[in-house]
């Protein structure tokens, strides 16, 4: 027993010495709580609500501090000034992608979300160009969303104003919009393969908010133990299989002179570069890039919509004002369009406040510095993970008085006109900002206004008893389950 104690002490000393060297040997990292051997600062964090822990630590250590996730240090940026300086003013230096084991195992450094360096730059540049040419952010995609919104309305009418859980239908719409861009076709909502794909997205989003996945990202060795990560990887395998089948169909019918969609454009690029020794345009990168676009374009929008309906149920006075504006500007005989937004300041403010309040991805994905840098008087070595707290910006009480309160007035001036805010960054900011931001904001506006144009939202309980608090608040904020009635107007 004495020998085991001595070995334990020696191991602890070795670990602490290693941590000290990482902190002081090559640079001077910001201060932070003292890490414990092996587990780092894990015991000082509330894995069910990381944001709460970061807020408390910021009060003690300031707007920039260091945390150890296991034995690996990460620098946390807390507050608008630090986040903007890093992501915008010095975007290139902070443009690396930090380690995220649960997805790194899947993507293997490919795609447009979890890649870094030239691979990321080239894949992102190509993807953005193709997506824009296919109508992303333009009238073409707006019309596609309007068509899908009408399909949603038809599906909601079939509920006959009976209580229903909106989750599945809210996933269908953004997923089908992505399908139309990537594969040039949509699916019926009762298509079995499509329903299974939606199930995978829904389950995985909920799993990402759980403490177990936070632990997995700190200790990837957990991969070899039983746990919810196994279901997550099983679901991803199903998603990849679905994507691969669609790509193979495209290969069989490809006409290089008439590309139909994103897959065709990528396959043509692959053919052009097949003789290059290190081309980024490979089948693996195509599959991963499609998976990235699907995940980013489906999960975030659908769950924001789910939170949105819950908030509108809780605040019927706000919902009534939005419907009044819809009636005045749009009426009931045409579909809402993006041009309407400039004439609907209150509705626009509500859309922004929903995204601010929901805070769907509280800490953004981890960044990494691409070189040794000096930042705020500290020396941060190349490769160090950077965690920007988006919550600290979206809930800044100087910019948004009473930030814990859902209040569209946060985005309205004294005259009732829409008021922009530089602090509005639910999609992160800078070079690593979400590539689908424009699409997501378009979907949110068009879908919610279309729903409220056709239905009155009826809660099953007193609005005062509705609790919009996330059921999980880890890497993502997971909305609670609920039912409501869509009563035709």
Curated annotation (Swiss-Prot):
InterPro entries, per the entry: Cyt_P450, Cyt_P450_CS, Cyt_P450_E_grp-I, Cyt_P450_sf, Cytochrome_P450_fam2
The enzyme's E.C. designation: 1.14.14.1
GO cellular component, one term: endoplasmic reticulum membrane
Superkingdom, taxonomy of origin: Eukaryota
Membrane topology, from the record: Peripheral membrane protein
Pfam families from the UniProt entry: p450
Keywords assigned: Endoplasmic reticulum, Heme, Iron, Membrane, Metal-binding, Microsome, Monooxygenase, Oxidoreductase
Broad class of enzyme this protein falls into: oxidoreductase
SUPFAM superfamilies the UniProt entry points to: Cytochrome P450
Induction: Constitutively expressed.
Gene Ontology molecular function, alphabetical: heme binding; iron ion binding; oxidoreductase activity, acting on paired donors, with incorporation or reduction of molecular oxygen, reduced flavin or flavoprotein as one donor, and incorporation of one atom of oxygen
GO biological process, any: organic acid metabolic process
Alphabetical list of Gene3D superfamilies matching this protein: Cytochrome P450 (1.10.630.10)
Catalytic reactions of this protein: an organic molecule + reduced [NADPH--hemoprotein reductase] + O2 = an alcohol + oxidized [NADPH--hemoprotein reductase] + H2O + H(+)
Positions annotated to bind heme: 434
Subcellular location per the Swiss-Prot or TrEMBL entry: Endoplasmic reticulum membrane; Microsome membrane
Cofactor(s) needed by this chain: heme
Family label: Belongs to the cytochrome P450 family.
Function: Cytochromes P450 are a group of heme-thiolate monooxygenases. In liver microsomes, this enzyme is involved in an NADPH-dependent electron transport pathway. It oxidizes a variety of structurally unrelated compounds, including steroids, fatty acids, and xenobiotics.
The protein's name in its UniProt record: Cytochrome P450 2C3
Organism the protein comes from: Oryctolagus cuniculus (Rabbit)
Taxonomic path: Eukaryota, Metazoa, Chordata, Craniata, Vertebrata
Record gene name: CYP2C3
């Amino acid at each position: 027993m004495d020998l085991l104690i001595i070995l334990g002490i020696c191991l602890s000393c070795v670990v602490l010495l290693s941590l000290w060297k990482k902190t002081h040997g090559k640079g001077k990292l910001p201060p932070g709580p003292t890490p414990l051997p092996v587990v780092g600062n894990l015991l000082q964090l509330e894995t069910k609500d990381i944001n709460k822990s970061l807020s408390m630590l910021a009060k003690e250590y300031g707007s920039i501090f260091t945390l150890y996730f296991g034995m690996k240090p990460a620098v946390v940026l807390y507050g608008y000034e630090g986040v903007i300086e890093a992501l915008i003013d010095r975007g290139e230096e902070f443009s690396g992608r930090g380690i995220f084991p649960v997805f790194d195992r899947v993507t293997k450094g490919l795609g447009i979300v979890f890649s870094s360096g030239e691979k990321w730059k080239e894949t992102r540049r190509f993807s953005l160009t193709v997506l824009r040419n296919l109508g992303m952010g333009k009238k073409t995609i707006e019309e596609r969303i309007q068509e899908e919104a009408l399909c949603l309305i038809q599906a909601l009418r079939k509920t006959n104003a009976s209580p229903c859980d909106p989750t599945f239908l809210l996933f269908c719409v953004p997923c089908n919009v992505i399908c139309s861009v990537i594969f040039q076709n949509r699916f019926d909502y009762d298509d079995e393969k499509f329903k299974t794909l939606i199930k995978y997205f829904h389950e995985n989003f909920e799993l990402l908010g759980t403490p177990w996945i936070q632990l997995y990202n700190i200790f990837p060795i957990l991969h070899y133990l039983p746990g919810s990560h196994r279901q997550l990887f099983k679901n991803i395998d199903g998603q990849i299989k679905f994507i691969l089948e669609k790509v193979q169909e495209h290969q069989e019918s490809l006409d290089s002179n008439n590309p139909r969609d994103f897959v065709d454009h990528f396959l043509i690029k692959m053919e052009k570069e097949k003789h290059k020794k290190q081309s980024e345009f490979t089948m693996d990168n195509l599959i991963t890039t499609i998976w990235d676009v699907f995940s980013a374009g489906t999960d975030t929008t659908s769950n924001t919509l789910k939170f949105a309906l819950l908030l509108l149920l809780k605040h019927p006075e706000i919902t009534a004002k939005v419907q009044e504006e819809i009636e005045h500007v749009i009426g009931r005989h045409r579909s809402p369009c993006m041009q309407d937004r400039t004439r609907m300041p209150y509705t626009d403010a509500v859309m922004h406040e929903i995204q601010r309040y929901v805070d769907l991805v509280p800490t953004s994905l981890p960044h990494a510095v691409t070189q040794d840098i000096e930042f705020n008087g500290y020396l941060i070595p190349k490769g160090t993970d950077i965690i920007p707290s988006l919550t600290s910006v979206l809930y800044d009480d100087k910019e948004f008085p009473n930030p814990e309160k859902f209040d569209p007035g946060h985005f309205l001036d004294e005259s009732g006109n829409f008021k922009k805010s530089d602090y509005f960054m639910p999609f992160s900011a800078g070079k690593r900002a979400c590539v689908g931001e424009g699409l997501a904001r378009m979907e949110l506006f068009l879908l919610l206004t279309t729903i409220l144009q056709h239905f009155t939202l009826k809660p099953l309980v007193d609005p005062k008893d509705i609790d919009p608090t996330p059921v999980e608040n880890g890497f993502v904020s997971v909305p609670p389950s609920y039912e409501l009635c869509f009563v035709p107007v």
